[in-house]
A protein has these predicted regions:
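Conserved, well-structured ligand/cofactor-binding cores
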Residues: 1-163
Length: 163
């Protein structure tokens, strides 16, 4: 429509970014499963002798740290998604604004879900300094992007419910 001609190039660029982001998130699903396998294996290691216990602890610590990497990346990608959704909600068609609200809610849910996967691993880490750093990064993403997703959702709800 003529009404959206001024932002058509912006929307096309957003579509390209969103498609690339979707593909990255899909790949992270498998990466998350792949990262869990070594952690599961570490839990199964024997700890009957002091040497075995020390080996298990070291392997487990490394696996816990690695198991945080993918959920943190998922969180970063969800944050990118929320930023894209802000633009869609501001520039997109009124007929598609509900899609922006849905995307904001889903990105927020995925962001929060991924944070739980970080927290369950950091809780079990022996290196409390490393765990605190990972928790701080997770908290920062939650603090910024949950509120931004909520703002998009509220804005879209307002547009849909009020004339």
């Amino acid at each position: 429509k003529k009404k959206y001609a001024a932002v058509e190039a912006d929307i096309q660029a957003l579509n390209t970014k969103a498609d690339a982001l979707r593909k990255e998130l899909e790949a992270l699903v498998q990466a998350d499963a792949d990262a869990f396998a070594p952690l599961a294996a570490a839990y199964g290691l024997p700890k009957d002798t002091p040497e075995q216990a020390a080996h298990k602890a070291a392997v487990l610590e490394k696996a816990l740290d690695a198991a945080c990497a993918v959920p943190l990346e998922v969180m970063e990608k969800c944050a990118e998604g929320i930023a894209l959704v802000e633009e869609y909600a501001a520039k997109g068609s009124v007929m598609a604004v509900s899609d922006a609200g849905c995307a904001a809610a889903l990105c927020k849910a995925a962001l929060q879900a991924a944070s739980l996967n970080v927290f369950i691993n950091t809780k079990l880490m022996a290196d409390r300094e490393r765990a605190a750093a990972l928790d701080a990064k997770t908290d920062k993403l939650l603090d910024e992007f949950v509120s931004r997703a909520d703002a998009v959702f509220a804005s879209v709800t307002n547009k849909l419910r009020n004339k």
